[in-house]
Amino acid sequence: MSQNLKFETLCLHAGQEPDPKTLSRAVPIYRTSSYVFKSSKHAADLFSLKELGNIYTRLMNPTQAVLEDRIAALEGGAAALALASGTSAIYYAIINICAAGDEIVSANNLYGGTYTMFNSILPQFGIRVKFVDPREPENFAKAINEKTKAVFIETIGNPGLEFTDIAAVADIAHQHHLPVIVDATFTTPYLIRAIDHGADIVVNSMTKWIGGHGTGIGGVVIDSGKFDWKNPKFRLFNEPDGSYFGIRFAHDLGDLNPIAFILRMRLVPLRNLGACISPDNAWMFLQGLETLHLRMERLCHNAKQTARFLKNHPKVTWVRYPGLEDDPSFPMANRYLKNGFGAMVVFGISGGRNAGEKFIDNLALFSHLANVGDAKSLALH
């Protein structure tokens, strides 16, 4: 689809043409586990990647394909892969590059679930994560060594709301021929396309603002198509892959080489571990995308107004919101974000833990739950 189309048009149209059989304008939900092969040769061509098409819904599904193409267009990427959750998206992005003995360098201001995965789970598989303070990009350079295979950051840190200098971190990573993986959940492509600033891989928990209504769980990985995986340090891409017919993903894909990362993720981690998204959840996230631009604009406005209100409240001791001009993240966020500063506000109240619990327990309109990105306001402590 034309790259000249506006963001809101891509939200509605990217990745889809009316169904050729039924002429349905809306995206159908394809509830099927598998697909009929036209012939033995057709099946062989699909498995050998001579032809791309549907084999089994653990690998791909037509509803899922529209979602992937639409998000890839919104992020400015070459291809995308939708998965069962944001957590599985991050995990697959890492194990698609790293094996036992490898390392990644990560910002330390991460969502708690990601931090636990990096600090406790990945080491069990022999993958070491070095955590650094992302406020000084040179910290990444100091932590990189010959075992490093990737650099990981979040656009806006969860929950501290610090904004990372994406381009500076990307420059350092690329000097060492390393890919940058950016979790853009808190910004979505409406606020920033991280690929435009040097990200090689973008991950997003669609459960949050992309879905926008708290009705489904899903994640997505977007491949910029710009990173060269032929460097021998990326042995998973350069050595014959025993789990998929001995293919060398950095060398044997022909015209598909630019999307080697996503193809390998689909054919190795997803095919063999199975964290696939359901067609119904894919369809729900497509509904969310249709209003993403409208919701994010209003959510950012409401968050800024809330932050200003809290800033002047006598019982509030501090407020973090990247859109406040005196916030430590404002100078950096203002450089990158042109459509708003996000939909989250973090603050502290006087009186310590007891006061915090009393505040949470007396909420009326706001819901107390473990999620973010819902259309309905929520609070979490």
Where are these regions (language model features)?
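N-terminal glycine-rich, Lys/His-bearing helix-loop that initiates the first secondary-structure elements
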Residues: M1-E51
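Conserved PLP-enzyme active-site core in the AAT-like
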Residues: S2, C11-H13, E17, A79-H313
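Glycine-rich beta-alpha junction loops
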Residues: Q16-P18, R31-F37, K208, G225-K226, ...
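Short Gly/Pro-enriched turn/cap motifs at secondary-structure boundaries
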Residues: D19-K21, I210, G274, R335-L337, ...
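Short amphipathic alpha-helical segments
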Residues: L52, A78, N281, F285, ...
